[in-house]
């Protein structure tokens, strides 16, 4: 059996890593190849091109690096047309993967898109391309199946999110503090996750650090910890080493899971990390900034969509504070961080609601995906 997979960024590599592990258990001799990151490679995946080349955000970055992406996309399409897989799975990265899927499907290859494009937020017109590109959408959010069915008469299958299964409902935080060498700390532990992409981190890290300094100056006592999302961010972190050190922030070259599981509270960028923090039952403050052009175009396409962060989308209310674009200022971050430390009753409520959502999301994701995959291959 031959299976093609393309993941475009770290969150896709996390999903792909657990999926490749499960596929290798079910089909030990399968050739599984395409584009992926370190977690997928560790599970036995062959990456034909570096995943980092696809990890872009914002319209300016796409314009500046777009030619390389287009070249890689054309090469991966040609490769799979010449080395036809039994099935192709595009993990997220819809702007890249839907075109790949469309071309491969037109060549007679079965295609799956894993992680629904957020057409319920913006660019709903993409449903036309989705219909042409993919045989099945695998949704990781519970409400998406009904959205596709009722609004677009298209089948999306809810497969859950692997994190909901892999992260326990009740976390032994002491275990992860011991693992990180934080044993015995009596201070509340605040995880700081300014993003996984260079552009995100360059915009958010300085703001986060200044807000934390104001928190310290106001007399708040805490221990801040931060994961290094990937080695390529080391030079950027080094640029702010003096501030990081003066705040006593410990930077760990480990995955975000361990850092979040060791934490009491979190300050982080909007994105998949907010889902992970929610499953770790962390009251949080979310910040995000795009370039002015990306923000302008994004707002034209999104309109007045209410929420950006996964906890708010899933809860259907602003259960945690989002500070987006011009609202993402040092003063606003500081104000919300103070609230995070001061309002225990609110934090207890947030934890209770996150636990309810977590329980609803638990499903054996990989087994469900393999079941879908088997059915599609049998019918072909």
From Swiss-Prot:
What pathway is it annotated to? Bacterial outer membrane biogenesis; LPS lipid A biosynthesis
- Keywords annotated in UniProt: Glycosyltransferase, Lipid A biosynthesis, Lipid biosynthesis, Lipid metabolism, Transferase
> What InterPro entries has UniProt attached to this entry?
Glyco_trans_19
* Record EC number: 2.4.1.182
- Top-level taxonomic group: Bacteria
One GO term describing the cellular component = membrane
| One Pfam family of this chain | LpxB
Task: From the UniProt record, list the reaction(s) this protein catalyses.
Answer: a lipid X + a UDP-2-N,3-O-bis[(3R)-3-hydroxyacyl]-alpha-D-glucosamine = a lipid A disaccharide + UDP + H(+)
Q: Please, one GO biological process term?
A: lipid A biosynthetic process
Top enzyme class: transferase
A GO molecular function term, named singly, is: lipid-A-disaccharide synthase activity
Tell me the HAMAP family matching this sequence.
LpxB (MF_00392)
Q: Which family does it belong to?
A: Belongs to the LpxB family.
**What does this protein do, in the record's words?**
Condensation of UDP-2,3-diacylglucosamine and 2,3-diacylglucosamine-1-phosphate to form lipid A disaccharide, a precursor of lipid A, a phosphorylated glycolipid that anchors the lipopolysaccharide to the outer membrane of the cell.
Name this polypeptide is given:
Lipid-A-disaccharide synthase
Q: Kindly list the organism's lineage.
A: Bacteria, Pseudomonadati, Pseudomonadota, Gammaproteobacteria, Thiotrichales
């Amino acid at each position: 059996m031959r299976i093609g997979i393309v993941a475009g960024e770290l969150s896709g590599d996390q999903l792909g890593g657990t999926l490749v592990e499960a596929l290798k258990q079910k089909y030990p001799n399968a050739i599984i190849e395409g584009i992926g990151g370190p977690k997928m490679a560790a599970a036995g995946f062959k990456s034909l091109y570096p995943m980092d080349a696809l990890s872009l955000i914002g319209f300016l970055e796409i314009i500046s690096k777009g030619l390389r992406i287009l070249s890689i996309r054309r090469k991966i399409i040609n490769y799979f047309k010449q080395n036809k897989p039994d099935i192709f799975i595009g993990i997220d990265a819809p702007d890249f993967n839907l075109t790949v899927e469309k071309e491969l499907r037109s060549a007679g290859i079965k295609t799956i898109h894993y992680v629904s494009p957020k057409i319920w937020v913006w660019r709903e017109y993409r449903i036309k391309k989705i219909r042409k590109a993919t045989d099945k959408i695998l949704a990781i959010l519970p409400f998406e199946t009904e959205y596709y069915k009722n609004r677009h008469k298209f089948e999306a299958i809810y497969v859950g999110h692997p994190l909901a299964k892999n992260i326990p409902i009740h976390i032994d935080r002491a275990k992860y503090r011991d693992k990180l060498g934080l044993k015995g700390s009596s201070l509340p532990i605040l995880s700081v996750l300014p993003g996984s992409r260079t552009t995100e981190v360059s915009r958010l890290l300085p703001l986060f650090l200044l807000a934390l300094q104001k928190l310290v100056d106001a007399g708040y006592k805490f221990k801040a910890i931060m994961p290094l999302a990937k080695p390529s961010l080391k030079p950027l972190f080094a640029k702010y080493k003096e501030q990081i050190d003066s705040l006593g922030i410990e930077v760990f070259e480990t995955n975000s899971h361990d850092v979040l599981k060791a934490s009491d509270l979190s300050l982080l960028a909007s994105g998949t990390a907010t889902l992970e923090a929610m499953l770790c039952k962390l009251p949080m403050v979310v910040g995000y900034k795009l370039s002015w052009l990306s923000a302008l175009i994004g707002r034209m396409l999104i309109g007045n969509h209410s929420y950006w962060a996964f906890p708010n989308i899933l809860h259907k209310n602003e259960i945690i504070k989002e500070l987006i674009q011009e609202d993402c200022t040092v003063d606003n971050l500081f104000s919300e961080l103070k609230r995070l430390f001061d309002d225990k009753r609110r934090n207890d409520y947030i934890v209770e609601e996150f636990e309810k959502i977590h329980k609803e999301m638990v499903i054996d994701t990989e087994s469900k995906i393999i079941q879908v995959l088997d059915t599609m291959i049998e019918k072909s």
